[in-house]
């Protein structure tokens, strides 16, 4: 597999500014992610004392992996964690069949950075992936997309439920027959390869052997990344929640100070010209599981109130729940990073472009709880380029970097005009210009008479519309005459810039596994990566 790094002319300059140590951006974080001294400081930080307990919890969480047991690399990393090794951590929602490709790329980011830190500092750093099983927005994880090569188009594949679950994703148990039907739909759209049957069997076995939504997600990730020694933990895992009880109590006691700190930091980021990323009305920033629903907690000055059942608690009652039933609580976007860092001895947190902006709004929250914000690193961004698409780019002389940023619409329109009669286009455009000049002359003739002005303008509008229609229909006919080329432009678009964004935000990992083999992401096949803020192109 070939691998190269390209620099894109990105519209969003947040990550390029992190790369260049822009003082406005670095001031939003505790550490400058582009400076080696930041890593030296984090590597030398004193541990919090929770590492042995965490190692036991992670071992328990991963003990139910049935398809294949823990790898020797994972066993070793659990031991390293118990002995005080620091971690590189990142997380993601449990998306259908692994979710978007960037989930895998986030894990590769964690693997790559932890290995580089281990090699540089001669201290073992453990890669940890945090499954956001506490989320309840099922609409965000119940679908994915598949590319149909025959049609040259993307198709949405969705797991359907009679009712949308309101509990956390970790507490959701999908209907296995319906999930297998969804999987079948996915594979119908994918081309048949020598890898298809084996991949389908792996997915079927995962559905057969696991029951909860997040356990199926965990099993797929484990099968893919076990050889790298990645450790997995679900935020909603009950033994982990019991460890979090002291922090839940602190959050409840300091909820107003926490909310004030968050709002103040968010306002500062807006004062620096950034858009507010975290949108929340709560002033407690926790959820409570009640009546099989994940419910947002707010405080009205006297009581803590749940948003779906209107149940209320006095302070002592809700703190008692945190003490004795912490598994009923879950964090929101503000408190999850805080809890994560309170638990782990983290060198760096790896996040997506939006995630790292969330963290920029939390600096004062960390300081309030005397928890230091780790280095916040943008994850690796990766695109897969197959031989066919590379040949099509060459055929139409389209720069890869341009497609990744802008898509192919500009190049497609240019191609259509090149196939058309230049004289025809020039004459129509000339008639449009002539009509505009004529309209100006007519308006001069009727100046001062509003009725006639309206008449002339309406007449001009009709003529311009007719000329526009003529030109558009002519170009549409040219487009239809070049239907093979149009399909090829669509192929490029759906592969490299699907739905107006990067491939990794839309494509599913099963597509890559089906095209290039079930070992494509394994250490024996996948190219060794170096951490970069630029874009990585991989040719399988």
From Swiss-Prot:
Key words, A-Z: Coiled coil, Ligase
Coiled coil: 425-453
Keyword Ligase: yes
InterPro entries: Bacillithiol_biosynth_BshC, CC_BshC, Rossmann-like_BshC
S-S bonds: none
Top EC category: ligase
GO molecular function: ligase activity
EC number: 6.-.-.-
Keyword Ligase in annotation: yes
Pfam family, one: Rossmann-like_BshC
Function of the protein: Involved in bacillithiol (BSH) biosynthesis. May catalyze the last step of the pathway, the addition of cysteine to glucosamine malate (GlcN-Mal) to generate BSH.
HAMAP family noted in UniProt: BshC
Record-stated family: Belongs to the BshC family.
Record-given protein name: Putative cysteine ligase BshC
Organism ancestry: Bacteria, Bacillati, Bacillota, Bacilli, Bacillales
């Amino acid at each position: 597999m070939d691998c190269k790094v390209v620099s894109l002319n990105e519209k969003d300059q947040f990550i390029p500014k992190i790369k260049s140590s822009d003082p406005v951006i670095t001031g939003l974080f505790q550490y400058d992610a582009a400076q080696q001294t930041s890593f030296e400081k984090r590597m030398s930080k004193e541990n919090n004392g929770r590492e042995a307990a965490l190692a036991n919890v992670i071992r328990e969480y991963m003990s139910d992996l049935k398809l294949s047991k823990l790898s020797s690399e994972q066993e070793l990393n659990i031991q390293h964690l118990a002995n005080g090794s620091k971690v590189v951590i990142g997380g993601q929602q449990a998306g259908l069949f692994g979710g978007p490709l960037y989930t895998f790329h986030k894990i590769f980011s964690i693997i790559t950075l932890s290995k580089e830190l281990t090699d540089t500092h001669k201290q073992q750093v453990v890669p940890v992936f945090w499954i956001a099983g506490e989320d309840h927005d099922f609409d965000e994880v119940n679908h994915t997309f598949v590319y149909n090569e025959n049609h040259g188009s993307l198709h949405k594949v969705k797991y359907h439920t009679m009712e949308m679950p309101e509990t956390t994703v970790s507490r959701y148990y999908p209907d296995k027959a319906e999930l297998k039907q969804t999987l079948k739909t996915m594979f119908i759209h994918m081309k048949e390869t020598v890898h298809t049957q084996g991949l389908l069997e792996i997915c079927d076995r995962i559905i057969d052997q696991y029951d909860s939504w997040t356990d199926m997600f965990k099993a797929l990730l484990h099968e893919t990344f076990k050889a790298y020694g990645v450790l997995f933990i679900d935020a909603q895992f009950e033994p982990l929640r019991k460890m979090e009880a002291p922090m839940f109590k602190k959050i409840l006691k300091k909820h107003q100070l926490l909310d004030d700190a968050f709002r103040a930091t968010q306002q500062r980021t807006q004062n620096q010209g950034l858009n507010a990323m975290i949108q929340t009305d709560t002033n407690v920033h926790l959820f409570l599981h009640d009546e099989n629903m994940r419910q947002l907690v707010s405080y009205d000055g006297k009581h803590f109130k749940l948003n779906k059942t209107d149940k209320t608690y006095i302070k002592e009652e809700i703190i008692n729940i945190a003490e004795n039933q912490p598994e009923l609580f879950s964090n929101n976007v503000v408190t999850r990073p805080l809890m994560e860092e309170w638990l782990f001895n983290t060198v760096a947190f790896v996040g997506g472009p939006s995630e790292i902006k969330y963290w920029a709004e939390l600096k004062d929250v960390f300081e309030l709880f005397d928890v230091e914000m780790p280095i916040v690193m943008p994850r690796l961004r990766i695109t897969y380029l197959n031989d066919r698409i590379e040949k099509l780019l060459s055929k139409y002389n389209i720069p890869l970097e341009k497609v990744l940023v802008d898509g192919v619409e500009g190049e497609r329109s240019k191609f259509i005009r090149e196939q058309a009669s230049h004289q025809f286009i020039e004459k129509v455009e000339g008639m449009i210009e002539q009509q505009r000049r004529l309209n100006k002359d007519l308006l001069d003739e009727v100046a001062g008479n509003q009725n006639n002005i309206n008449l002339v303008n309406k007449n001009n509008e009709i003529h311009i519309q007719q000329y526009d229609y003529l030109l558009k229909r002519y170009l549409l006919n040219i487009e239809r005459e070049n239907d093979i080329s149009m399909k090829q432009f669509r192929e490029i678009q759906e592969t490299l810039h699907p739905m107006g964004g990067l491939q990794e935000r839309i494509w599913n990992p099963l597509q890559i596994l089906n095209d290039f083999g079930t070992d494509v992401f394994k250490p024996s096949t996948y190219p060794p990566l170096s951490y970069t803020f630029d874009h990585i192109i991989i040719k399988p």
